[in-house]
């Protein structure tokens, strides 16, 4: 399983990165499968450096804040009006309840416009599982001001845990346990951001990974441009026993178990 960091800026696109978007790819029986985790503001442009968006097999939306879903409007335009490539049926989108209406509101101007001619929406459920080609996905409801999910993705012998946006919660333990890579929200800085129930800090992300047990790698993401990523890394390093990685736009990571 390959993970490509398309966008990793927190809360809004930054000067060097779009908002949240992560591309998973893997081969199965001679066919390349591609799944997106989130498609936030600015990410559709960057995605085209890595793959043809017309060839996606599914999109998983962690939640419906714009920095995680807004570019579905642009992808709808691409899939509807591309002069040379016809969309091959509707694209499966696994998302919290209400996603079709949410994206339709963003797409329309004077009124909500349907996007269900291009997308087939499936409502996520806590601990619910879906399979897309070689990817087995389990969704975990996490702690954020709106309905939000983390995803545990298994492909062959590799496991990725993506927290989406969350604060510390009980679901992080089964989400992260034994993962080859934890891709963790680190939007808050511990010494400054005292609000709870919204985001992890670097330290809280590391604490969750240690508590889960068996995590091989920890990568921090979703860092807003007003934060210094090295501060987030330093907070996590106080707890995490290994190297604390920082997600970088256009980075490609190959995942496999030892």
Listing of model-derived features with the role each one plays in the protein:
Residues 86-148, 155-156, 249, 255:
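Metallo-beta-lactamase
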Residues 42-91, 178:
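Active-site metal-binding motif and surrounding structural segment of the metallo-beta-lactamase
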Residues 51-54, 89, 117, 133-135, ...:
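Structured loop/turn residues at beta-strand edges in well-structured enzyme cores
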Residues 168-257:
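Cap/insert and terminal regions of metallo-dependent hydrolase folds
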Residues 36-40, 57-63, 67, 96, ...:
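Active-site neighborhood of phospho(di)ester-bond hydrolases with catalytic His/Asp-centered motifs
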Residues 47, 72-75, 103-106, 172, ...:
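Hydrophobic packing residues within well-ordered alpha-helices of enzyme cores
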Residues 40, 143, 167:
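Adenine-nucleotide cofactor-binding loop residues
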């Amino acid at each position: 399983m390959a993970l490509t960091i398309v966008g990793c800026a927190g809360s809004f696109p930054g000067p060097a990165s779009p908002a949240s978007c992560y591309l998973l790819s893997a081969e199965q029986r001679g066919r390349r499968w591609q799944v997106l985790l989130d498609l936030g503001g600015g990410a559709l442009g960057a995605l085209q450096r890595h793959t043809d968006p017309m060839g996606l097999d599914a999109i998983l939306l962690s939640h419906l804040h714009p920095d995680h879903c807004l570019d579905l409007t642009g992808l709808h335009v691409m899939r509807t009006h591309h002069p040379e490539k016809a969309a091959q049926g509707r694209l499966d989108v696994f998302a919290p309840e209400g996603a079709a209406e949410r994206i339709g509101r963003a797409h329309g101007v004077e009124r909500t416009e349907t996007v269900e001619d291009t997308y087939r929406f499936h409502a996520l459920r806590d601990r619910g599982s879906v399979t897309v080609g070689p990817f087995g996905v389990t969704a975990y409801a996490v702690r954020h001001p709106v309905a939000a999910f983390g995803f545990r993705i298994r492909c062959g012998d590799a496991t990725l845990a993506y927290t989406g946006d969350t604060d510390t919660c009980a679901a992080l333990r089964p989400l992260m346990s034994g993962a080859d890579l934890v891709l963790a929200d680190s939007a808050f800085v511990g010494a400054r951001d005292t609000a709870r129930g919204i985001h992890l800090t670097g330290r809280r992300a590391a604490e969750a990974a240690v508590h889960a047990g068996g995590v091989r790698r920890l990568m921090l993401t979703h860092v807003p441009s007003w934060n210094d990523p090295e501060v987030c890394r330093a907070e996590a390093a106080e707890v995490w026993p290994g190297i604390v990685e920082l997600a970088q736009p256009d980075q490609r990571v190959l995942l496999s178990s030892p």
